[in-house]
């Protein structure tokens, strides 16, 4: 009897070990292979200028994906992030022009993101309304506010010091890249090293069990959506700085790109599973694919098809992983 249990426990251990290694680093390996292939076959891909451009291109999605990671890990998602990006940029531009104060404008943009996240979190956690319906509604509301505040037009920013947020270079790299790295580190530590992060994963794994175990589910969910709104607002402010204006029509459909990156990297749509390395892998893969398509002059319409296929593949892959875990 004991020999059976010993041999039975030995076999799964090695397979689990391999599965754990693949789960941790598999998509990073996929990115490495993709990167090498692009460096070989795509003209001008491996140049320093293009690498800086790639870093800038994924910086915004990297920031927003940090907040989306927590939403997905808790079993929810946030469809309002793209609208918050646009509205935060517009709000910042309008307030800077009205007050002639850079910091008041930035604070107003950040406050808008926090308030949007607070509304999402309260309605979802306290009123127990489905996250899809709630964030779909706030997506429309916030986008509408962006058009109302800007009168449907791009709002130019008169204070040129604001542009330094998007165009500053620190140690040879653009500031948005460093800010994205900082976001990834902070949110990674928050998820893996704090009680808040463990509570987030517990809620996503089994919300009722987490509640019975004493996890403050409502408070945790509200904080999660506030964080998502905050990082989306930061991304929107930096985007406005780089575009030298707040534009209400920007980042339409961006929420799907961010969700695709998270799920492609390995974050589960059902909740309870998520690591910052998954987000890094997902945004790097998506960013590399998009960069390669641009260098190859692939039609923008065809790029929509490719993005859709990647999203579909990510969802199918997530479904397969969940099914495989249940059968083990």
Curated annotation (Swiss-Prot):
One function term, GO molecular function aspect: L-arabinose transmembrane transporter activity
Membrane topology value: Multi-pass membrane protein
GO CC entries: ATP-binding cassette (ABC) transporter complex, substrate-binding subunit-containing; membrane; plasma membrane
Keywords: Cell inner membrane, Cell membrane, Membrane, Sugar transport, Transmembrane, Transmembrane helix, Transport
Keyword Transmembrane attributed: yes
Cell membrane among keywords: yes
Signal sequence region: none
Segments passing through the bilayer: 29-49, 53-73, 79-99, 104-124, 129-149, 171-191, 220-240, 249-269, 276-296, 297-317
Induction: Induced by arabinose. Transcription is dependent on the transcription factor AraC, the cAMP receptor protein (CRP) and cAMP.
GO biological process: arabinose transmembrane transport; L-arabinose transmembrane transport
Record localization: Cell inner membrane
Functional description taken from the UniProt entry: Part of the binding-protein-dependent transport system for L-arabinose. Probably responsible for the translocation of the substrate across the membrane.
Membership in a protein family: Belongs to the binding-protein-dependent transport system permease family. AraH/RbsC subfamily.
Protein name per UniProt: L-arabinose transport system permease protein AraH
Origin species: Escherichia coli (strain K12)
């Amino acid at each position: 009897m004991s020999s059976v249990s010993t041999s039975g426990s030995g076999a799964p251990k090695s397979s689990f070990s391999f599965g754990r290694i693949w789960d941790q680093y598999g998509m990073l390996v996929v990115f490495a292979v993709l990167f090498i292939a692009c460096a070989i076959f795509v003209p001008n891909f491996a140049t320093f200028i293009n690498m800086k451009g790639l870093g800038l291109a994924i910086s915004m999605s990297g920031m927003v994906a940090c907040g989306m990671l927590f939403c997905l890990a808790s079993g929810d998602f946030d469809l309002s992030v793209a609208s918050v990006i646009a509205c935060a940029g517009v709000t910042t531009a309008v307030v800077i022009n009205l007050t002639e104060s850079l910091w008041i404008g930035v604070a107003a943009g950040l406050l808008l993101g926090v308030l949007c996240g607070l509304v999402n979190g309260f309605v979802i956690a306290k009123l127990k309304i489905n996250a899809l319906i709630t964030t779909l509604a706030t997506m429309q509301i916030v986008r509408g506010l962006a058009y109302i505040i800007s009168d449907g037009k791009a709002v130019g920013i008169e204070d040129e010091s604001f542009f330094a947020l998007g165009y500053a270079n620190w140690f040879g790299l653009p500031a948005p890249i460093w800010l994205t790295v900082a976001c990834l580190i902070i949110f990674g530590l928050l998820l893996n090293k704090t009680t808040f992060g463990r509570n987030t994963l517990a809620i996503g794994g089994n919300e009722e069990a987490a509640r019975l175990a004493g996890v403050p589910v409502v408070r945790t969910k509200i904080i999660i959506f506030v964080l998502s709104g905050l990082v989306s607002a930061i991304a929107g402010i930096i985007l406005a700085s780089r575009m030298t204006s707040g534009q209400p029509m920007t980042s339409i459909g961006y929420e799907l790109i961010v969700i695709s990156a998270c799920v492609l990297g390995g974050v589960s749509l059902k909740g309870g599973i998520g690591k910052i390395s998954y987000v890094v892998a997902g945004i790097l893969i998506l960013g590399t694919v998009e960069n390669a398509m641009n260098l190859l002059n692939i039609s923008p319409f065809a790029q929509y098809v490719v993005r859709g296929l990647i999203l579909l593949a990510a969802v199918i892959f997530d479904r397969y992983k969940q099914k495989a875990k249940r059968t083990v």
